[in-house]
Amino acid sequence: MKNKILNTVLISILLLVVVFFVSTNFIINVQWFKEVGYLNVFFTKLIAICKLFVPIFILYFCVIAIYLFTLRKSIRSLVGDTKFKSVKKYFLLSNLVISILGAGATATTQWYKILQFTNAVPFGEVDPIFNKDISFYVFKLPLVQSLFSTAISLIIILVLITVIIYLALGFKDKIYQNKDNVININSKTYGIRKFAGKQLAVLASVLSLLIGCSYLLKSYNLVYSTRGVSYGAGYTDVKITMIFYKVIAVACVISSIVVFISILKLKFRPIIISIASIAVLIVLEPVVAIFTQQFVVKPNEMELEKPYISYSIDATKKAFNIDEIEVKEMEPNENITSEKLEDNKDIIENLKVNSTGPLLSFYQQVQLIKNYYEFNDADTDRYNINGKYTQVFVSPREINRDSMTTWQNKHLRYTHGYGLAMSRVNSVTEFGQPDFVMKDIPTVNTTDINLENPRIYFGESDNDYVIVNTEGGEFDYPTGDTENTFNYNGTGGLKMTPFNRVLFSIYERNPKILMSSSITSESRIILNRNIVKRVQEIAPFLTYDSDPYIVVHDGRLVWMMDAYTSTDKYPFSEPHEGVNYIRNSVKVVVDAFNGNVDFYVTDENDPIINCYLKIYKGLFKPLSEMPEDLKEHFRYPQDLFELQSKVLTKYHVDDPIKLFTEEDLWDRSLEVVKHGGENLSQGDEGKEESILNKAKENKNNEAENEGLYLMTKLPDEENVEMMLLDYFNMRGKQSMVALLGARMDGDNYGELVMYKFPPQRTIYSPILFKNRIQQDPNISKEISLWAGKGSEVIYGDIIIVPIEDSLLYLNTIYLKANSENSMPEMKRVILSNGDKIVIEENIEKALLKLFNYSSSEENKNSNKDETPKNEITSDNSGIKEAADLFNKAIEAQKNGDWATYGEFINKLGDILNKMSQE
């Protein structure tokens, strides 16, 4: 008795341990979703699956049970009365297993489609063939097709059950003797027809009926056809294929009746004829369609396909939100006058003279402070700095976890990044280096931007958990040879109770969490610190932009991310990057200190986000609840902009004839991305791979020019604003034909503006401008001289901005010594308008040389504090400059950057020589 009790206790404990191990992930998910405030979102899926599982299980179980019940007489005849009761138990158990597996598979794969179906929101647009609202294709048709597939699968399962039972019972008992009143299963008088003839007749009839209905549903898929010259149903699809599908559907209905009757009457000829007829129709359809396409449509393709091309143009433009672009014609004037520059001096003041790649390289050399920090990315944003609207580069200083070798350092000690580097986009120092407004540790802030808490616990590179509030504290930031510590006082993380210590030791497969004496009951474990993974865990049904950016808000740091709703089910819209409908419907804000995540709806007209609002109650907030100062940092997402640009290369036209003849196809402008070494000029570094950013280099080291965030002013506007610009060429040519701009300031957010240039004129595109630079004898001579001295020449971003009815071209040149720790510095500015091109040390000199223009304000764009070479204005200024150069040389020496050290010493020598001559 005692042994039985002991065994029972041991088995119970063992079961509890197994259940605990199996449910570890579930328990942690429940705690984590509760911490972030979205527990209802987590349970939405589970509740939906459970709600679906029960009725689907009952349906499966009842259908199979009823079917088996119809076989009871045949089974009893095979096994006899004595064995029938035991056989019934096996059938019941098998039915349970099959029903559980079938219901589980259906519920776990179809729950989302069912929620979309029941919460569908109309688009208010119908397709031109079936006149169905777009919501039918996006929310309803996928579920209906899946359910039909499930029904067909169930019929096949029932057929297999019949065959398995028939064979299993036959092999089990082999040959039964007539004296036992059991029929011989192998006798000619008792085959499978007599065993389950009526049942199979019903199944065959239902299967034929389902196949017929599936062809009717298949007709709706013609709106995604790729047969014709445009995406979506074409002439052949509508006039031939659709008719065949209807005929096949009718034939299947007739066949279902014929099959049912024929099986019952043992007449197989009608079955063969009906099935053969359907097979002939199925084979004949593509043959007739190909014949029609080749011999009817092709000779008259323009006339026959014209309406369907129009459908594709309209649908694609609406689906990618490019149907309301403000298009303007521009005839560029090749001469920019000084008066025109003075009228647009705010554009000149904000010309972008820094490029992301070289700037990030400089940040990594100068602003890391210690090797356990890293800068993953440098993003463009704008702030009101000391009362002036200013565009800046911002890069957060995160912890480099790859440099951590011990568990304590990686998870307990180095828990967070610290601060950021911020520099002006439109200016550099006298040495061509970034003009910082925030830098160093602790943060040196020369702006009126309030940053009280610069700590970053959640970021782009934080892929591991950390445990905070431990004995000994966390490393905060270095000051000389000492280290400052910090104890986390935020709201993020889960309390490390004894239960959780055991739980996370199992989950992370690391006993140190349980055994470490540094962890107390007040400690917290912070999970999902990578901001992309964090938001994906909460809302995996959204697509996220590859470039989150950090914002200073209310004295702390927050991340802003763009999220998209998308589908590939929009009728007649040609897919790009796997989607054929997309909206930037959500802005996500993640607190870098606490990890709080807020989802704000920015497009209330998007049916997909409105469907999600009905499904996930409490997940999304209205935009009106977002703090106003955060709205000032909205950016038009670059991934979406580049996707729209790709679509526009073909779908910028409204005339179906032009699309058919391909006489007006565009390409996004190319740019040389490598010259004399590593490319550092293109785009934001550290961008995540995304379905929306897949530009690739060609064999000539050319890639599509990435859209650039610039501060500029449209010809018809009064105020400067941040915009995203992209450039287009005629297909196969390099002359620029259009400029696309996305607006993002204030009420203009989301507006797209396009300037079209006359195609008969040669308008320099980015790559033509780059070629012109390299072919100019004065510029190429200077560049060759630098390259000959062992320096690496790096081109910055090519900027093309409209100034009223003219175009101004800008490119910067960086020099970088060929040494491991050297830093790129901006040394020359190339400026061009019309046929004139100049190269100078800074914007001011380039403007003076090109236009004889000197702004009334001093040194706005670059080299703000520069004293021109050979013009030392006073002894004090010369001494100050010499002292500054000496300090920079010493700093370069400490960093082991001997190339930069030598450069500073040479400059110092020049100044001292000039001073001695005076």
Swiss-Prot record:
Keywords: Cell membrane, Membrane, Transmembrane, Transmembrane helix. It is a multi-pass membrane protein. GO terms for cellular component: extracellular region; plasma membrane. It is found in: Cell membrane. The keyword Transmembrane applies. This is UPF0182 protein CPF_0011. The chain crosses the membrane at residues 8-28, 46-66, 91-111, 151-171, 200-220, 243-263, 271-291. The keyword Cell membrane applies. Residues 857-876 are annotated as: Disordered. Pfam families: UPF0182.
